[in-house]
């Protein structure tokens, strides 16, 4: 179903730059790109590019390379699931609430332009509170600066995190329910790890170590959608997650003097971070209403994206361009990664840093982060769900909540909602590259034994 568009507010098609004709398949596009996208999806067309898959797509050249045009349609946010498979006129009305909110806002802006006689670019609408300042660069106190980056690679760190060792995870051969079964429901004997936080507000056992504070979580305020408020309450504190992971990594070091290889240590950090993410999902509204099979299907689809987003948001808060902050609190300079981690991992880290800069410029806040996390979990791209309608409803509500929040709190940046969704496209691309890297390491027998991430990769392929 297409929605009308007010031509007074000039906007150009994000695919080719032609004049926008309305809302088509998830966003504002021109009539030509609407028809092209619809025909491509309904006819299941497969294109090839005779160049380097980077052809310029504009109004005059949009028909020269259908491959690059279709890829750009997907990149800017046109949705495959919005196209009807029965070839009837009109798309699937999945985005109606979002369209209506966006259209109402544009009507309001148009009225304000006429009343005040100025362009939108000169400032936020009258009566709207000024946007919050960009998040400050997060700096560790001098006493908490982690050991020199080389310590992570060449030997045990000298700081409070110096007793790292490979955690002894109770990993047995995956049973018929896959590697996630024991995390979601401990009744399955192949996994013995249970929820670290069985109640929404329960704290994990505190491990010894210095305090590690991040900005206080947002506790509420005017015009914050209820869904986002609920997600903020479910989001674990960073210092609690750090303390639990550090404790898990230190535990086996008490009984062994040798130190694990740096890459093995990073894999175990990722394992423990993912366990925290699974725990968050288990307590998440809607998710806990799904059958176990659907829960595992969703997590197997998005586990790598959730890990990437977790890392990205930590760097946005950290605020440094020449180093990264690990979940354990250690700082690692990018120059160290370049020298000792290999070219593949270095290129992956640099690509992630580009997204960090982009999100920092967009002033990504905690409210938007928890909403993006929820959107990744409830992806509409997942097939073979028993309760697809519940997942679809969760996705639509999260989209609407994020749109409402960005329009209300960042009125000076009218396309922030769309920009955030485009960042999710890059998160997915990064996650694909990360999985390829892990599988490359696995084929070279460089992955630690009983690694949960490799089990997730293998479960996805079976």
Curated annotation (Swiss-Prot):
Compositional bias of kind Pro residues: 126-139
SMART domains membership: HOLI (SM00430), ZnF_C4 (SM00399)
GO biological process: adrenal gland development; calcineurin-mediated signaling; female gonad development; hormone metabolic process; hormone-mediated signaling pathway; Leydig cell differentiation; luteinization; maintenance of protein location in nucleus
Protein location: Nucleus
Signal peptide extent: none
Mutagenesis / variant outcome for changing residue 314 to M: Strongly reduced transactivation
Start-end of NR C4-type zinc fingers: 13-33, 49-73
Residue ranges: DNA binding: 10-85
Record's comment on post-translational modification: Acetylation stimulates the transcriptional activity.
Positions of post-translational Phosphoserine modification: 203
Domain NR LBD: 223-460
Chief localisation class: nucleus
Gene3D superfamilies referenced in this protein's UniProt entry, alphabetically: Erythroid Transcription Factor GATA-1, subunit A, Retinoid X Receptor
UniProt GO molecular function: chromatin binding; enzyme binding; nuclear receptor activity; phospholipid binding; RNA polymerase II cis-regulatory region sequence-specific DNA binding; transcription coregulator binding; zinc ion binding
Residues bearing the modification N6-acetyllysine: 34, 38, 72
Covalent cross-link (Glycyl lysine isopeptide (Lys-Gly) (interchain with G-Cter in SUMO)), residues: 119, 194
InterPro entries assigned to the protein according to its UniProt record, in alphabetical order: NHR-like_dom_sf (IPR035500), NR5-like (IPR016355), Nucl_hrmn_rcpt_lig-bd (IPR000536), Nuclear_hrmn_rcpt (IPR001723), Znf_hrmn_rcpt (IPR001628), Znf_NHR/GATA (IPR013088)
Binding site for a 1,2-diacyl-sn-glycero-3-phosphocholine: 342, 437, 441
Quaternary data: Binds DNA as a monomer. Part of a complex consisting of SFPQ, NONO and NR5A1. Interacts with DGKQ and CDK7. Interacts with NR0B2, NCOA2 and PPARGC1A. Binds to and activated by HIPK3.
PANTHER family for this protein: NUCLEAR RECEPTOR SUBFAMILY 5 GROUP A, STEROIDOGENIC FACTOR 1
Function field: Transcriptional activator. Seems to be essential for sexual differentiation and formation of the primary steroidogenic tissues. Binds to the Ad4 site found in the promoter region of steroidogenic P450 genes such as CYP11A, CYP11B and CYP21B. Also regulates the AMH/Muellerian inhibiting substance gene as well as the AHCH and STAR genes. 5'-YCAAGGYC-3' and 5'-RRAGGTCA-3' are the consensus sequences for the recognition by NR5A1. The SFPQ-NONO-NR5A1 complex binds to the CYP17 promoter and regulates basal and cAMP-dependent transcriptional activity.
Protein name: Steroidogenic factor 1
């Amino acid at each position: 179903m297409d929605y009308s568009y007010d031509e007074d507010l000039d906007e150009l098609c994000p695919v080719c730059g032609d004049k926008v004709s309305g809302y088509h398949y998830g966003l504002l596009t021109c009539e030509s790109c609407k028809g092209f996208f619809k025909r491509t999806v309904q006819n299941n067309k497969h294109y090839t590019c005779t160049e380097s898959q980077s052809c310029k797509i504009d109004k005059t050249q949009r028909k020269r390379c259908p491959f690059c045009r279709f890829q750009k349609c997907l990149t800017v946010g046109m949705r495959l699931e919005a196209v009807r498979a029965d070839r009837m006129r009109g798309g699937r009305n999945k985005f109606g609430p979002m369209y209506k909110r966006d259209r109402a806002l544009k009507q309001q802006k148009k009225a304000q332009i006429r009343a005040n006689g100025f362009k939108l670019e000169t400032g936020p609408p009258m009566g709207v509170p000024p946007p919050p300042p960009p998040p400050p660069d997060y700096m560790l106190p001098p006493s908490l600066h982690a050991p020199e980056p080389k310590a992570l690679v060449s030997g045990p760190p000298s700081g409070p995190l110096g007793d790292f060792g490979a955690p002894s995870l109770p990993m047995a051969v995956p049973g018929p329910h896959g590697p996630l079964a024991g995390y979601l429901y401990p009744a399955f004997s192949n996994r013995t790890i249970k929820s670290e936080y069985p109640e929404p507000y329960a704290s994990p056992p505190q491990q010894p170590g210095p305090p590690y504070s991040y900005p206080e979580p947002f506790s509420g305020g005017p015009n914050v959608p209820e869904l986002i408020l609920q997600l903020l309450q479910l989001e674990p504190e960073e210092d609690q997650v750090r303390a639990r992971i550090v404790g898990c990594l230190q535990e086996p070091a008490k009984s062994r003097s040798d130190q694990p290889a740096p890459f093995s240590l990073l894999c175990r950090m990722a394992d423990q971070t993912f366990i925290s993410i699974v725990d968050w999902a288990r307590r998440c509204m809607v998710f806990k209403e799904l059958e176990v099979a659907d829960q595992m299907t969703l997590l197997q689809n998005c586990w790598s994206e959730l890990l990437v987003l977790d890392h990205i948001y930590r760097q946005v808060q950290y605020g440094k361009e020449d180093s990264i902050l690990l979940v354990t609190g250690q700082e690692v300079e990018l120059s160290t990664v370049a020298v000792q981690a290999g070219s593949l991992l270095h290129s992956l880290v640099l690509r992630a840093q580009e997204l960090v800069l982009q999100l920092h410029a967009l002033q990504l806040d905690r409210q938007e982060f928890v909403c993006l996390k929820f959107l990744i979990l409830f992806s509409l791209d997942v097939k073979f769900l028993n309760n697809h309608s519940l997942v679809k409803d969760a996705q639509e509500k999260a989209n609407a909540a994020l749109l409402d929040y960005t329009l209300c709190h960042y009125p000076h940046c009218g396309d922030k909602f769309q920009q955030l969704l485009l960042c999710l496209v890059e998160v997915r691309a990064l996650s694909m590259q990360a999985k390829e890297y892990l599988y490359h390491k696995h084929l070279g027998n460089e992955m630690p034994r009983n690694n949960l991430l490799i089990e997730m990769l293998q479960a996805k392929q079976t």
